[in-house]
Amino acid sequence: MEEFKGYLEKSRSKQQHFLYPFLFQEYIYALAHDHGLNVNGSIFYEPAEISGYDNKFSSLLVKRLITRMYQQNYLINSVNDSNQNRFVGHNKNFYSQMISEGFAAIVEIPFSLRLASSLEEKKEIPKSQNLRSIHSIFPFFEDKLSHLNYVSDILIPYPVHLEILVQILQCWIQDVPSLHLLRFFFHEYHNWNNLITQKKSSYGFSKENPRLFWFLYNSYVVECESILVFLRKQSSYLRSTSSGPFLERTHFYEKIGQHLIVLCCNDFQKTLWLFKDPFMHYVRYQGKSILASKRTHLLMKKWKSYFVNFWQCHFHFWSQPCRIHINQFSNFSFYFLGYLSNVPINPSAVKSQMLENSFLIDTVTKKFETIVPIIPMIGSLSKAKFCNVSGNPISKPVWADLSDSDIIDRFGRICRNLSHYYSGSSKKQSLYRIKYILRLSCARTLARKHKSTVRAFLQRLGSEFLEEFFTEEEKVLSLILPRISYPLHKLYRERIWYLDIIRINDLVNHL
């Protein structure tokens, strides 16, 4: 890693990143395979359980790969022999996976260094580490959204052509061989046209090369948000130096400059005045984003117009305006990070008395609420074969061959993870129903394995069976308040947000 930093420091003055020679270094693939960049603090999170090839790394295979690349016959061999296993015991696309992993590891370096340098200048590294949890978004919602009026529910459009992804990287990395190699990946895998596909409100990814996929997707999303950042920086009284990278990009103003002038009615400063809104907030996770404001519906329509026109002229594809929904908080609920959130208006009357006169004062309070969406969650549990489409628990036959302890541990872990993730719910009834489904599904699976009834099996296990499904908070409260006979749901009315959740739960991600 230090060698990479030294190399890039020398080339930074030329604003060029010649990354292609790194592909011929053996340790690149060891670094990519072992996820060394993630361990050392890479900005791109990748689940360790997602892997496209055998976890056992072989230096011999890497040397053969490097040799074939030097001989300039790898491209021909990969095209003619893409469906055959190259080595016994390894996946058929091992070479392509290794190169894509190495390419992703190399191309991450300039972006990682740029982010690290910007954080060092602003001295925000400890702050950014504390806010890595996606649960940190919801306390922000609690503080801000109750004072706002309108919200735009935005689905970031997906690229219609993979060449768009190459052009995005071209604005940041002026290394033609590396970009040609990326194009080769796209042409070799015919099914990569489904690299980014629309699936409800989220994006689906192929799992063959997850590191490269996530990097390309993050780059694309940053480009989609560039118009938002650009306008906010230009409209700010305190100009930030972080808007500098926009000036370095070769095609930014050529592509959208003229179109922006038309939209702004030849007066850019008057248009920027519309965006000087101190009560506007923007939050995004994956392909779903929220734009909220305290100002009028007209301003939100202006933002929608700018987003749609920018996506059309900059990415050369038609962006459906229906992907941006503008609504009032008082009568709208939006899905975000697996929660169904809203800001309802609660009217109340307060009686006031002054001397002999008394009168009623009508007041309105707004409170941010987060609810577990039970119907989509039942759909996710049904797809995972924990219940049927009606929410009735069923046994999971594929786990019936495991030991009793493994079955209970798996169900208990899923239940605790969901309880941990949905700990910030305002109303716990839906969460208790999900836990009931998982507990009874576990009991049915064990009863199926032992060819017994659920009632008989629960009587034999007793309370020890239920303890596996308790969260740490429930165990602590049961020790502190052992004599209180109130049911558990009365003890958990307060929302709890955790700072150790760095990605969305898999079952929740089906929403």
Curated annotation (Swiss-Prot):
Keyword vocabulary terms for this entry: Chloroplast, mRNA processing, Plastid, RNA-binding, tRNA processing
GO cellular component labels: chloroplast
Localization terms from the record: Plastid, Chloroplast
Domain of life: Eukaryota
A molecular-function term among this protein's GO annotations: RNA binding
Main location: plastid
Any single GO BP term: mRNA processing
InterPro entries: Domain_X, Maturase_MatK, Maturase_MatK_N
HAMAP family per the UniProt record, alphabetical: MatK
Family classification: Belongs to the intron maturase 2 family. MatK subfamily.
PANTHER family: MATURASE K
Function: Usually encoded in the trnK tRNA gene intron. Probably assists in splicing its own and other chloroplast group II introns.
UniProt-recorded name of the protein: Maturase K
